């Protein structure tokens, strides 16, 4: 069966010359990995196997553990007899999946955790996707209609923050204030017993050709073993296509992800957590950049709209002139 990428079509038999083309410096890691595992599959199965590898490395929203198991089992089915033993589900625990080379060295792996993180490790490159809080098929996710979690006394925390006139002014007029709020909010969280404070840099892209994505910052801290996000200027996006972000947010880490995911289906949102606010501000500054040249290593995806998946397929397509 042909492998469709964009408007192209990859024949089942992949020529050596075409494979050589993927050795460019900007070759995505999964394509480099493919060179190491393509001999596991006969020529008539290579296209389907390559499509499966691409899906493993770029999981669609709503992917579950069962989907991952199914994809690795498909690869085992497509592989030559003997080589299927190099494709593992549950080698180091039920949420660990990997493909090994002939020397039993890891080529590619996927690790799942209990909070919906799906981490792909591939040729020294790591990319994390935040998929869903529901890990079992048929479990529906709940829309987060509230802004303040009930797990902690978030309402009281917000009111106390507002007692500071400088912080209150920024909360009341949130546009462009998120960076300057990081330090006072983190100080407040420290005073309230939160530890492992991190500074979350966030990019929001409307389209792949956007010159300057929207940047945003929030503060993350841990209390009694659970992460919480203080995003007290989130409501600056209420009139920018994300109407349910209608107030300051103090939510658990999972609730925060769900809140943003429910806010938009067409924007690309990803983040990185830093131990230092200055590093966060520099890494996620509001300067021109190209999505095409952005490294996704170490970033956690909150949303992955269809246009982004199309963009990645076009960018990483093997289709070209022979």
From Swiss-Prot:
InterPro entries for the chain: Tox-PLDMTX_dom (IPR028907)
Entry GO terms, CC: extracellular region; host cell cytoplasm
Record keyword Nucleotide-binding present: no
Result of changing residue 216 to A: Does not affect regulation of macrophage migration
Pfam families attached to this UniProt entry: Tox-PLDMTX
Domain of life: Bacteria
Stated consequence of mutating residue 231 to A: Does not affect regulation of macrophage migration
Keywords tagged on the record: Host cytoplasm, Secreted, Virulence
Localization in the cell: Secreted; Host cytoplasm
Predominant cellular place of this UniProt entry's protein: secreted
Subunit field text: Interacts with host IQGAP1 and host TRIP6 (thyroid receptor-interacting protein 6).
General function of this protein: Effector proteins function to alter host cell physiology and promote bacterial survival in host tissues. This protein is required to maintain a long-term chronic systemic infection in mice. It inhibits normal cell migration of primary macrophages and dendritic cells, by a mechanism that involves interaction with the host factor IQGAP1, an important regulator of the cytoskeleton and cell migration. Also accelerates the systemic spread of infection from the gastrointestinal tract to the bloodstream, probably by interacting with host TRIP6.
Record's protein name: Secreted effector protein SseI
Organism listed in the record: Salmonella typhimurium (strain LT2 / SGSC1412 / ATCC 700720)
Gene: sseI
């Amino acid at each position: 069966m042909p492998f469709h990428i964009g408007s192209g079509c990859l024949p089942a038999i992949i020529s050596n010359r075409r494979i050589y083309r993927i050795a460019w410096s900007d070759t995505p890691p999964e394509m480099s990995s493919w060179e190491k595992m393509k001999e596991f599959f006969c020529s008539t199965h290579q296209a389907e196997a390559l499509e499966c590898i691409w899906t493993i490395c770029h999981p669609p929203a709503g992917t579950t553990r069962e989907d991952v198991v199914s994809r690795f089992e498909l690869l085992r089915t497509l592989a030559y007899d003997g080589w299927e033993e190099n494709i593992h589900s549950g080698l180091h625990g039920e949420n660990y999946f990997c493909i090994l080379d002939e020397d039993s060295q890891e080529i590619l792996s996927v690790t799942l955790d209990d909070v919906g993180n799906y981490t792909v490790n591939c040729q020294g490159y790591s990319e994390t996707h935040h998929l869903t809080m529901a890990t079992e098929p048929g479990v529906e996710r709940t829309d987060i209609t509230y802004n303040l979690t009930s797990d902690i006394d978030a309402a009281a925390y917000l009111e106390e923050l507002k007692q500071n006139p400088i912080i209150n002014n920024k909360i009341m007029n949130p546009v462009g204030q998120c960076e300057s709020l990081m330090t006072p909010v983190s100080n407040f969280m420290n005073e309230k017993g939160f530890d492992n404070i991190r500074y979350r840099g966030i990019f929001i892209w409307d389209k792949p050709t956007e010159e300057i994505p929207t940047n945003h910052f929030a503060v993350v801290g841990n209390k009694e073993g659970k992460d919480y996000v203080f995003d007290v200027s989130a409501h600056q996006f209420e009139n920018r296509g994300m109407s349910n972000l209608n107030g300051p947010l103090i939510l658990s880490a999972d609730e925060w992800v769900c809140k943003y995911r429910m806010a938009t289906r067409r924007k690309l949102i990803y983040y990185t957590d830093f131990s230092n606010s200055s590093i966060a501000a520099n890494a996620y500054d509001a300067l021109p950049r190209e999505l095409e040249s952005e490294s996704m290593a170490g970033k956690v995806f909150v949303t992955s709209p269809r246009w982004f998946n199309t963009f990645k397929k076009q960018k990483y397509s093997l289709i070209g002139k022979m």
